[in-house]
Design a protein with these regions (language model features):
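Conserved, well-structured interaction surfaces
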Residues: 1-47, 68-81, 86-101
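Residue-level detector of alpha-helical recognition elements and their boundaries
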Residues: 22, 52, 58, 98, ...
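Short, flexible loop/turn elements at secondary-structure junctions
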Residues: 56-59, 98, 162, 183-185
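Flexible, glycine-rich phosphate/dinucleotide-binding loops
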Residues: 46, 61, 123
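An aromatic- and glycine-enriched ligand-binding surface/loop that stacks and positions planar moieties
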Residues: 1, 50, 80, 88-89, ...
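Second-shell loop/turn segments in exported
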Residues: 65-74, 128-133
């Protein structure tokens, strides 16, 4: 919600300027809508019922405190509708290409909107079992998917070698990547770079080189599955 607060502040600030005073208003609004929609998407898939706070209903601490994660006992459909609305607005506002590497473009928004719609289409009960598939929502997702795949051979396509997606020499250069988060290393900052902290936490504990955190531990079931007999 720290991230959500920042998006909401940005959207509120953007609403106070005109296109004449700030020609990039529409593009920047689309970028922030994408980020907010994507962040809420990941929150939604983790916790299902979450409070929806935006630039209109969450202006004060009191406002936020009064927001329920299930207004009037509703199901979670309204959350998907908000998430998809943000992402579809991003599709409308963003350009096909951005001048600066790492900025979100229309294809990134199309892909994220399609992903959210695919999740939304599969209705689940209280035990997270799929009980219904909404074909109309799947058709909405297919529109965005087709808009991307129709560019095959041009802006998008599969790499001859799948490994190219992960090798540094192909950074921001493969047609298979829809959008890439930008990381850096040894960039002159005090932290040593804008790195993926989550990935760093997976390294085995190895003082003094890796003091933390060895997260990639197998489960007991996995260990037992490969336990040798005596």
């Amino acid at each position: 919600y720290v991230a959500i607060s920042r998006y909401n502040l940005a959207l509120y600030a953007l609403s106070k300027v005109t296109d004449e005073n700030y020609p990039l208003k529409g593009v920047r609004t689309g970028e922030v809508k994408f980020l907010r929609g994507a962040t809420y998407f990941f929150m939604k898939t983790l916790w299902r019922y979450i409070p929806w706070v935006d630039e209109e209903n969450g202006r004060t601490v009191e406002d936020v405190t009064n927001i329920s994660n299930r207004p009037n006992g509703t199901d979670d459909t309204y959350l998907w509708e908000h998430i998809v609305a943000d992402l579809e607005e991003a599709v409308r506002l963003l350009p096909e290409k951005q001048e600066e590497i790492g900025r979100i473009n229309k294809n990134a928004a199309r892909a994220m909107a399609a992903k959210a719609l695919l999740f939304m289409a599969y209705k689940q009960d209280a035990r997270h079992q799929v009980v219904e598939v909404d074909k109309k929502i799947l058709e909405r997702a297919l529109v965005y998917i087709n808009e991307i795949t129709d560019q095959e051979g041009g802006n998008v396509g599969l790499c001859e070698d799948f490994a190219e997606n992960f090798l540094p020499e192909y950074d921001n250069a493969t047609k298979e990547a829809i959008w890439e988060i930008q990381y850096s290393i040894n960039d002159g900052t005090s932290s040593g770079g804008n790195t993926n902290n989550g990935a760093e936490l997976n390294a085995p504990s190895w003082e003094p080189y890796f003091p933390c955190c060895d997260f990639h531990k197998m489960s007991f079931n996995m260990a037992n599955a490969f336990r040798t007999g005596t």
